[in-house]
Amino acid sequence: MVDGDAEEVARSAEESTEPVKIVQRLGHRGLTIATAESLTAGALAARIADVPGASIALLGGVVAYSNGVKENVLGVDAELLETHGAVDGGVAAQMAQGAALVCRAGLGVSTTGVAGPEPHQGKSVGTVYLGFYVAAGVVQRLGIRMPENCSQDETASVEGALAGYRLLDLDGDREAIRWASVEAALQLVSDVLHTEPTGLPHA
């Protein structure tokens, strides 16, 4: 879990992870990425798309604010949504998987959480789950493993794929929580890529 002041979390992630570096690293490995966003409502995809030439890696994204879109577009399990609500690690992982499958990308990353100002479905303001999914072929080709400070999700329906999530517990206002969620999601993508056994060049 990553916890603390939302603005501090955002700045720390922003300083250590530049979107241009992520796009370059994805491109150098022939990898593509797709996003699924709830509380960030497209801001994560926009952050990646700000990089000139981002189309080499970014295939698309889904803004899944409602449970209906999570279920019907991204394929999130209806029973999971009913039992645990939208703000859940398993939901985040399935959202990431759904984005990757819908967009036919090698990697998927997602955001779901409570930006405020009020709690939601029993989850406190600042509770955020970031999900990720790595296709089986990418796992096999690059040896991608579970990054630190993440939990594996066993509901990935594709054999050999890797799916998981990272929990954030943030203090701050709505804007700061959404900002931190975007930057922390980029950090998560970087962390996933850095599990490649040979490491990544600083390109």
What are these regions (language model features)?
Residues 1-203:
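Short alpha-helical segments enriched in small residues
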